[in-house]
């Protein structure tokens, strides 16, 4: 199992203890979800394959006062991880047309 703090240090991203707790809660929701939002194998590597990869996008966008749309959001990736580290400087919109996944996203947010 991966270490969450190691994942953030590889990105040179400092996150508060509160933000790290939110990532852990989000991870638990994804892993415990019955509809298999990510594969069983990916669950072991969620910090790198999903959270770390999502946050790499922050290197390419200015994270301040933006409206960001995550189309086909599925499990909320990359929208939710980006929202967690942007410190409410942006507005995020998660778009998902599959009802069960949209219900999951509503539960998360």
Can you describe what each PLM-predicted range is?
Residues 2-63, 69, 107:
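Class I SAM-dependent transferase core
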Residues 55-109:
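Conserved SAM/SAH cofactor-binding pocket of Class I
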């Amino acid at each position: 199992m991966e270490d969450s703090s190691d994942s953030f240090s590889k990105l040179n991203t400092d996150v508060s203890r509160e933000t790290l707790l939110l990532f852990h809660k989000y991870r638990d929701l994804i892993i415990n979800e019955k509809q298999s939002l990510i594969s069983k194998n990916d669950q072991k590597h969620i910090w790198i394959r999903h959270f770390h990869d999502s946050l790499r996008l922050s290197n390419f966008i200015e994270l301040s006062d933006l409206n960001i749309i995550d189309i086909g959001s599925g499990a909320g990736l990359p929208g939710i991880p980006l929202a967690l580290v942007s410190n409410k400087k942006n507005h995020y919109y998660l778009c998902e047309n599959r009802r069960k996944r949209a219900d999951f996203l509503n539960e998360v947010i």
